[in-house]
Amino acid sequence: MKPGPPRRGTAQGQRVDTATHAPGARGLLLPPLLLLLLAGRAAGAQRWRNENFERPVDLEGSGDDDSFPDDELDDLYSGSGSGYFEQESGLETAMRFIPDMALAAPTAPAMLPTTVIQPVDTPFEELLSEHPSPEPVTSPPLVTEVTEVVEESSQKATTISTTTSTTAATTTGAPTMATAPATAATTAPSTPEAPPATATVADVRTTGIQGMLPLPLTTAATAKITTPAAPSPPTTVATLDTEAPTPRLVNTATSRPRALPRPVTTQEPDVAERSTLPLGTTAPGPTEMAQTPTPESLLTTIQDEPEVPVSGGPSGDFELQEETTQPDTANEVVAVEGAAAKPSPPLGTLPKGARPGPGLHDNAIDSGSSAAQLPQKSILERKEVLVAVIVGGVVGALFAAFLVTLLIYRMKKKDEGSYTLEEPKQASVTYQKPDKQEEFYA
């Protein structure tokens, strides 16, 4: 037996197999290498593009060396190159309003669930539903952040709670003020278990306490929670319509009061700064407030007259001066010191001893001979326009006649000149040939 040739054959077969499998392995390695090369090129191009976008080269002026559009540049700086500006990143602003960990008080009474505060009309239910459920955290820096958040939310809640309490009082007729949690409608709830840093949140001043009382005839007054005995000038005025039974509350805090007698202000009841209810207990039944109007109350109406701003300086024609002699009392009931309400006079009539105030029609410009004050006349009825039309027509007719006569004269002169030019030609032609021939032959 000769085993040599079979072994050589097997070796050659193995060599052929490796030779055939080597290109396949290379083909499998080429696509990952190409992908890595393309990824490196793309990363380099992206880095170069980001560097050019973030740090452009200042070629012409000092106002073009940033990557912001023109609308945002107006808010940041003027572009004169005299100063620097700091741009806050979006991550910092997002971290302010959406913190990673929930803000909570070190004790549970600082932020109660919505079911415990349900009997009191407070706007904190929506605020608590937006944030996740708080967990008790005992770190001291979080205590100060909680107090600031509660103060801001309580100040924002003063304007919303007064409107909800007035609508509930007018529809159901039940009083909305409670004795113990009286400060819950306008300030943040504070409990005795809370630390003193959070207990001072209740000392928030409000000026819209008028909306909590559902009185049909309330006096124009405001009261502060911390100092209820000190009267203040009226900022909220109740205007009563003669036909509608429900009163309308009109806020005229920005208007200036007229020269009227000072109304008697009603003092709000003393409100406890800190509630004494333990945790887990509901508020007691509300106590009814006295709703009888005092006989010395004064229901005043404040009238605002329009003021026309003039940019050209003070001129007597376009200024509307305010006078306090005659307020417009149409559709308004004014009760002075308990007297019976008098019917309002009809429009256009004035009481005795009162002179009419300045109106919009009294400020008209004095009528004169100017063309701006006579828009109702036609153009041809004015003397200036009529004279101008007549003179223009005469001048135009004369100019047209002059042109016509000039053309006629030129035509006649041209005709006469043609006849004079043709006559010597005929004479010369008839004269030259026979004379020369006769003279030559002669």
UniProtKB/Swiss-Prot annotation:
Compositionally skewed regions (Basic and acidic residues) per UniProt: 48-58, 433-442
Position of the signal peptide: 1-44
One matching Pfam family: Syndecan
GO MF entries: identical protein binding
Glycosylation sites: 78, 80, 82, 89, 107, 161-163, 170, 172, 315, 367
Residues recorded as bearing Phosphotyrosine in the entry: 409, 419, 431, 441
Processing and modification events after translation: O-glycosylated within the Thr/Ser-rich region which could interact with lectin domains on other molecules.
Feature: compositional bias, Low complexity: 157-199, 276-287
Site (Cleavage of ectodomain): 383-384
Compartments in which it is found: Cell membrane
Membrane-side (Cytoplasmic) residue stretches: 409-442
PROSITE patterns xrefs: SYNDECAN (PS00964)
Positions with biased composition (Acidic residues): 61-75
A GO CC term attached to the entry: microspike
Membrane topology label: Single-pass type I membrane protein
InterPro entries to which the protein is assigned, alphabetical: Neurexin-like, Syndecan, Syndecan/Neurexin_dom, Syndecan_CS
Region listing for Disordered, in residue ranges: 1-25, 47-80, 152-199, 253-293, 305-327, 419-442
Transmembrane segments: 388-408
Subunit structure: Interacts with TIAM1. Interacts with PTN (via heparan sulfate chains); this interaction mediates the neurite outgrowth-promoting signal from PTN to the cytoskeleton of growing neurites; this interaction mediates osteoblast recruitment. Interacts with MDK; this interaction induces SDC3 clustering; this interaction induces neuronal cell adhesion and neurite outgrowth.
Function (record text): Cell surface proteoglycan that may bear heparan sulfate. May have a role in the organization of cell shape by affecting the actin cytoskeleton, possibly by transferring signals from the cell surface in a sugar-dependent mechanism.
Family affiliation: Belongs to the syndecan proteoglycan family.
Protein name (database record): Syndecan-3
UniProt organism field: Mus musculus (Mouse)
